[in-house]
Amino acid sequence: MSSDRAALKSAFLDAHGLADARRETLAGDASTRLYERLHRPGKTSLIFMDQPPSMESPPCPPGATDAERRALGYNARARLAAGRVEAFVACASYLRSQGLSAPEIIAADPATGLAVLEDLGDDLYAALVANGADEAPLYDAAVDALARLHRADPPPVLEADGLRWPFLTFDDLALRTGGEMFLEWWPKFAGMAPFSRDAEAEWETLWKPIRARGVAGASVFCHRDFHAENLIWLPQRTGVARVGLLDFQDAVRAHPAWDFSMLLHDARRDVSPKRATACLDRYLTLRPDLDRETFLADFHGLGALNSMRILFIFARQVAYYERPRYRALLPRVWGHLNACLAARELAPIRGWFDRHIPQDKRL
């Protein structure tokens, strides 16, 4: 961290009466954000979020064409928030308005990329289950939270504390980007020759109708990263508020199956088949407006697309950002992809993988 950035952070804390807080650095994630816990004598702790605005390529302007988005870079193509604090603040406000437990925003300055948040604690779903907690009540509550969120119709613009953030749709280019990046990165990562133009053309033909269904079903607030390391158990609260939510700033209007793929096709832990089936049954009971067979078909198709996106991200983390810990997660993600491709309707795509990516290259 530069001395200028350190001084800026100290000034921000001082302006909000937090200069005397003891600062504890927290473990980072795959993003460019940094977190600290602020300890205050006799008071509850807070979280200090640091996301320099210039660290990433820009987000997607609402009216940008596909060509303009491609020129702007990955965040605009995929409709990611580029770590913008105003996206986090606006999404948090919307989630809280739906009765869900996003952190309360104590202070925020989008211009500097700094914010102070409510501290929801350390009881991540992933850690609790790893230490022997029963996953059933945790996942039941997560499903209930998704059902609550998915029954609401989010507005085109999210607003909070004078900030506005466009709530964009997970459109064809955004869905396509994950697949395109997989085609680009996986051969380099696995030591393969680049895919031929014919293979890429066939790929596009196979995936286009699945993306079309994803866009047609884009009707809900999609957290986009709804998995066990972004969910915090808050047993002192009631109902869906027991599920604390993190890392939601990239939210988009999307198909409800996307969040379900993130929850059940978790890259970092195995959700038992029994629990996965129970989650799907519970969600569909809470959403009688959805047709079961149609939802499951979309869950498999979008789940496969999501798994490929994660494979690209982890391959890039290992090869480009030199974060080798992500390599250990790849076999599980391949397992999720293979499970999705086992669906009868995805047999042609399964055939593409069998022809173009040998088993020994599915690392």
Report the location of each language-model feature:
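Active-site catalytic-loop/activation-segment of kinase and kinase-like phosphoryl-transfer enzymes
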Residues: W165-I210
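ATP-binding pocket architecture of kinase catalytic cores
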Residues: H39-T177, K188, V215-A216
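Juxta-kinase regulatory segment immediately upstream of eukaryotic protein kinase catalytic domains
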Residues: M1-R22
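ATP-binding glycine-rich phosphate-binding loop
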Residues: L18-P41
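ATP/Mg2+ or Mg2+-diphosphate-binding catalytic cores
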Residues: F312-L363
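All-alpha amphipathic helical-bundle segments outside canonical DNA-binding/catalytic cores
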Residues: T169-F170, R292-G303
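Active-site acidic catalytic loop and adjacent metal/ATP-binding pocket
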Residues: T32-H39, I47-F48, L149, W207-F260, ...
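Active-site activation/catalytic loop segments of kinase-like enzymes and analogous catalytic loops
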Residues: E180-A190, R253-L290, A304-Y321, V333-L341
